[in-house]
Every structure is written in C-alpha cells, then in structure tokens.
Amino acid sequence: MTAVEYIELSGVPESRWPNFREWFKWHQDNYLVGIAKDGDKISGVAVARCLHEGEEPVHYVHRQDGNTAFVDLTVTSTDGSSTPYSRLAMKTLLSILWSRFGPRKNIVFNRGGKRKVYDYMKFMRKALL
C-alpha cells in the first residue's frame, strides 16, 4: 500500500478532493511528507510545511525559513481509532517533522478546517516523551 492509498483508505475529507493526488504529489516531491512504518507496513502519514507566522496557509507554498510548522494532514489509522499503535505512529511522524524542519516558533495543526496553534518546543517536549 502506498501513502496515498493509506490516506484514501482512511476516508479523511482531503482524500476526496478532486486534486488530492496532485496536491499530495507536490508535497511529496518537495519532501514535505512523513511516512511512519512498522516494517513494510505504513502506520501513519503526515503532510507538513513551513510558513511565516501569521501567513495564510495557501496551498503549494512552503517557506524553508518560516518560523511556523504547519501540519496540513495527519493520518495514523485507516479507521479513525486512537490506539497505542496510532499514538506511536504520531510520535514517529513528529520525530520525522523535527528531523526535517528542526525547531520552529509554532506548530499549527489543521483539524477539520480549524487551526490549533501551539508553542513548538512545549508541544514537542510533551508529545515526544
């Protein structure tokens, strides 16, 4: 199963966009996709990019020098359940994000069209313990 298929199987709203595969490919081509695996099996996928603080998260924009990590999408199960396995996948995805972007000022999650803003370092300390 590919990362795109994993997201589509989860049924998240983004997977039903008419341009979803194009959108995903752009992020993947720009190294903005994290994939957590358990052996050969995908256990989670995240799409994230950097923006300047307060900048509108317009699609197809990534600012390497941005001080905000904007997480467009996270999927850690295909059935929407939260389990110890899905929580471990989320920790893995956050570790990938840290490796890719390093420390930032904020981390923003897009959850159902609503944005949740957190202090990056405080969030990572809590999430990765």
Residue ranges and their predicted role:
Residues 18, 22-29, 95, 99:
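Polar/charged alpha-helical tracts
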Residues 128-129:
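Short intrinsically disordered terminal tails
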Residues 56-125:
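Acyl-donor binding region in acyl/amide transferases
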Residues 16-17, 30, 51-59, 89-90:
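Short amphipathic alpha-helical surface micro-motifs
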Residues 22-44, 49-52:
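A short helix-loop-beta-strand connector motif used in the catalytic cores of GNAT acetyltransferases and
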Residues 1-25:
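Short amphipathic alpha-helix that is part of the acyltransferase structural core
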Residues 5-10, 32-40, 64-69:
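A broad, low-specificity signal for short, low-complexity segments enriched in glycine/proline
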Residues 13, 36, 41, 46, ...:
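Compositionally biased, intrinsically disordered low-complexity regions
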